[in-house]
UniProtKB/Swiss-Prot annotation:
This is Probable bifunctional transcriptional activator/DNA repair enzyme AlkA. One of its GO terms (cellular component) is protein-DNA complex. GO terms for biological process: base-excision repair, AP site formation; DNA alkylation repair; methylation; response to nitrosative stress. The keyword Transferase applies. This enzyme catalyzes only one turnover and therefore is not strictly catalytic. According to one definition, an enzyme is a biocatalyst that acts repeatedly and over many reaction cycles. Pfam families: Ada_Zn_binding, AlkA_N, HhH-GPD, HTH_18. Binds 1 zinc ion per subunit. Residues 87-185 form the HTH araC/xylS-type domain. Signal peptide: none annotated.
Length: 496
């Protein structure tokens, strides 16, 4: 989009917040870059350039605007709707792959050489993987500087910088100030720094409209005991992260989500934040979805009633795949009970000072040691879970932020006991494919019949072609028409 100068300039003239995250505005006369909705007077057209990412702007020597804080914008929805290698790379970088495995590890996951990957990213997003990871480190550092009392040395290493000097230089170049000045400026803007060790409070930005009742209701109704709960108006869950465990509390509002993270290790902050955004589908483009689905007369009323539906997703793709298999042909409550047994038997214990969470969801390595006695499911279902876990453990099946959606579908369908419903639900909620469509889902077919749409799988699939590439969101809208606990927020009964 940044290549369309006229459209971008109209967006900054109208200060249209819908475009925040799609591109940044580099101002040649001041050397700063802004988000499209920056409240200052728009610069003359001759004095601006439009760049695809904050990393591209920083790479060309521009500093972040202190007024609009463009590095804190919602992420670009472009990377969530595309399945090409650049989009997959961007999702993996957001998950912290470069900091954990280096550029070589990122390239290997994608099946490209380092040089090929550098060339692709530079051409499309204006920055290579190292520059993109550096911009993320800067954002992590800024959050820790502004919302905690951590010493700056601890901030530097938690954010992924290799030295204090590199940290100070990056802050000065990106923000035109020192860490001390950033913390001082933040004191008037933010709540006082959290007193609890390992705790950080964030405000996750959201593109409006945001129909949070659907996504939070779904997460609440399917909560796994010991791993997830609803308490004091917040959805809470445990996190299994690269450097340790975490607990997150997420409280919705119309234009943001309040996120309280308790982490064993602050090096996990960037990854935890990215996974929370992914869980709630916060980087979706609701305007584009509403425009496309609302064009169908059969869906117009449903979409208009609650525009801005998000897909209830996951913090761990492999976890969701296991839970999807456990949910085959059973009630929502039974699926949660089965998963709760696994959590209690194989999950890592956590200490929850503010609630009743007890364990993380087990890792694939832990599930590889599974005792069938912990699963009160048919033997055929046990075989499916064992085959799924074995494939994930030996890496013949890869389910992560950067996997190829179509290839993953094919690999899932090759497993015994995995049919189209399971594969599509995993693609939709586990992998984030915006065009997944579980046509055989009973709830989806009941909702379709209620609206006068075809209720048979094949006929409904044919009809759904008009909703592409947003069939996952059409599914979510249809589900919301049913009387079911997944559509209740706050839940009518305690979830713990």
């Amino acid at each position: 989009m940044h290549d369309d100068f006229e459209r971008c300039y109209r967006a900054i003239q109208s200060k249209d917040a819908r475009f925040d995250g799609w591109f940044v505005v580099a101002v040649l006369t001041t050397g700063v870059y802004c988000r499209p909705s920056c409240p200052v007077r728009p610069p003359f057209a001759r004095n601006v350039r439009f760049l695809p990412t904050a990393a591209a702007a920083q790479g060309e020597g521009f500093r972040a605007c202190k007024r609009c804080r463009p590095d804190a914008s919602p992420g670009s929805p472009e990377w969530n709707v595309r399945s090409d290698v650049v989009a997959r790379a961007m999702r993996l970088i957001a998950d912290g792959t470069v900091d954990r495995d280096g550029v070589s590890g990122l390239a290997a996951q994608l099946g490209y050489t380092i040089r090929q990957l550098e060339r692709l990213l530079q051409a499309v997003v204006g920055a290579g993987p190292l520059a993109l990871a550096r911009a993320q480190r800067m954002q992590t550092a800024r959050v820790l500087i502004e919302t905690t009392n951590l010493p700056f040395g601890d901030v530097a290493f938690a954010a992924g910088f290799s030295s204090i000097r590199q940290f100070n230089d990056t802050v000065r170049l990106a923000c035109d100030g020192t860490p001390t000045a950033l913390r001082a400026r933040a004191a008037a803007r933010f709540e006082s720094a959290t007193a609890s060790a390992g705790t950080v409070s964030l405000r996750l930005p959201v593109r409006a409209p945001f129909a949070f009742e659907g996504v939070f209701g779904h997460l609440a109704a399917t909560a796994v005991p010991g791993c997830e709960e609803v308490r004091d108006g917040a959805y809470r869950r445990t996190l299994r992260l690269p450097w340790g465990n975490g607990i997150v509390s997420l409280t919705p509002a119309p234009d943001h989500v309040r996120c309280l993270l308790v982490l064993d290790d602050f090096r996990d902050l960037m990854t935890a934040t990215a996974r929370c955004r992914r869980l709630l589908d916060l980087d979706a483009d609701p305007e584009a979805i509403v425009e496309a689905l609302g064009a169908d007369p059969d869906l117009r009323a449903v979409v208009g009633k609650a525009p801005g539906q998000r897909i209830p997703r996951t913090v761990d793709e492999a976890e969701f795949a296991v839970r999807a298999v456990l949910a085959q042909q059973v009630s929502t409550k039974a699926a949660s009970t089965h998963a709760g047994r696994l959590v209690a038997a194989y999950g890592r214990p956590v200490h929850d000072r503010h609630g009743a969470l007890t364990h993380t969801f087990p890792s694939i390595e832990q599930l590889a040691e599974i005792d069938p006695g912990h699963l009160a499911v048919p033997k055929a279902r046990q075989r499916t879970i064992n085959a799924l876990v074995a494939s994930l453990a030996d890496k013949s099946l890869v389910l992560d932020a950067g996997c190829d959606w179509q290839r993953a579908r094919g690999q899932l369908l090759a497993l015994p006991g995995v049919g189209p419903w399971t594969a599509e639900v995993i693609a939709m909620r586990g992998l984030g494919d915006p065009d997944a469509f579980p046509a055989s889902d009973l709830g989806l077919r009941l909702a379709a019949k209620k609206l006068g749409l075809p209720a048979q799988r094949r006929a409904l699939t044919v009809h759904s072609a008009r909703w592409r590439p947003w069939r996952s969101y059409a599914t979510q809208h249809l589900w919301t028409t049913l009387e079911h606990p997944v559509n209740q927020w706050p839940p009518q009964e305690k979830i713990a």
